[in-house]
Amino acid sequence: MVNTKVTLCGIEMDNPIIPASGTFGYGYEFAELYDINMLGTFSFKGTTREPRFGNPTPRIAEYAGGLLNAVGLQNPGVDAVIETELPKLKQVFHKPVMANVSGFSVAEYAEVCEKLDAQEQVGWLEVNISCPNVHGGGAAFGADPKSAAEVTKAVRAVTKKPIILKLSPTAADIAAVARACEDAGADGMSLINTLPGMRIDLKRRRPLLANTTGGMSGPGMFPLAVRMVYQVYEAVSIPIVGMGGVTTAEDVIELMLAGAAAVGVGAANLVEPYACKTIIEDLPAVMERYGMENLTEIIGGAHHG
C-alpha cells in the first residue's frame, strides 16, 4: 500500500496535488464536477485590495506547447472574497485552502494578507511576486532579491500563517531570489509562474491577445519548471511547490524528484476540468511501477549525495 500523504509548511495533505491559482476559480465551480476534497488543497484566484476587471478580450491564445493567458488578475477584491467567495467554498471544501495574493505595492501585499490571515479556512498565503512594482519603476517584485525580500518581510509582520512566495521564471537568478525570501521569513516557495509570450494573428497581422503579451503555460513549460525547481531546491531549506506544465502523475513524480514537496497543476485544468482528479487516481499505480512506497521519501531524490 503506497502512501501519497505529504506535509507542506507543517500542514498535512492527503496527496501533493494543488490546482494552481487562476485555473480553479474559488473551487466551488469545480465541486459540481467532482468531490474536490480529494485534492491536497488548491490555490484560489489571485486576490488584490481593490476589485479588478482584468484585461480586455481575447485573453487566451493557444500554442503548440500550451496556452497564453492575459486575464489580468480579475477578482472582486479581498473584502468580497472574504464576504462572498469563502463562505461558498466552505460549504464544499473542508480542508485548509491556499490564498493567492497579488499586489502593486509592498503595503498592498501586507494589507491583503492581514485580512486573509483572520480567515480560519486559509491555511497558507501564496504571495505572487510576479506583479509589477508601480512605485519601483514597474519591474516585477520577484525580479530581484531585494524587492522580493521587502514583500516577504512586510507579509511576515502581519501573519503567523505559512507564507509561500510564488517566484517568476524571469528573475535573472531565481535561486538568489529564493534565498532572499527564505532569509526574510518565507516558509515555502512555489515555482514557476508563467513566462511572457506572444502570438500574432496572420489574417489581422496583429497580436492575438488584446493585451499583446500573455503568460505561457502548459506542457511546453515543464522542462523549465523541472530545472528551476531543481536549482531552487539546492539553494533553500524550505519546501517547494513545483508547477509548470504538469499534466500526468509521472510529471508529479519527476518534479518531486527535482525537489518539490507538493505539485501545482495549472493549464491542464483549463484544457481538461478533471485533470487533477485523474492525476490523483493515477498516482498510486505510478508509484508502484517505480517502486515508490512513500512520496515524502522521494522529495529531492534526483540530487547527488
Question: Which residues make up each language-model segment?
Answer:
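Short gly/pro/ser/thr-enriched loop/turn and capping motifs at secondary-structure boundaries
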Residues: 48-53, 132-134, 196-199, 270-272
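C-terminal helical cap(s) of enzyme catalytic domains, especially alpha/beta-barrels
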Residues: 55-64, 200-214, 256, 268-293
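N-terminal capping/small domains of soluble enzymes
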Residues: 1-97, 102-104
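Short acidic/polar active-site loop segments enriched in Thr and Asp
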Residues: 39-40, 45, 95, 122-125, ...
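A short, charged, Gly/Pro-tolerant segment at domain boundaries
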Residues: 296-305
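Alpha/beta enzyme core
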Residues: 83, 104-241, 247-260, 265
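Active-site metal-binding loops of divalent metal-dependent hydrolases
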Residues: 22-23, 244-246
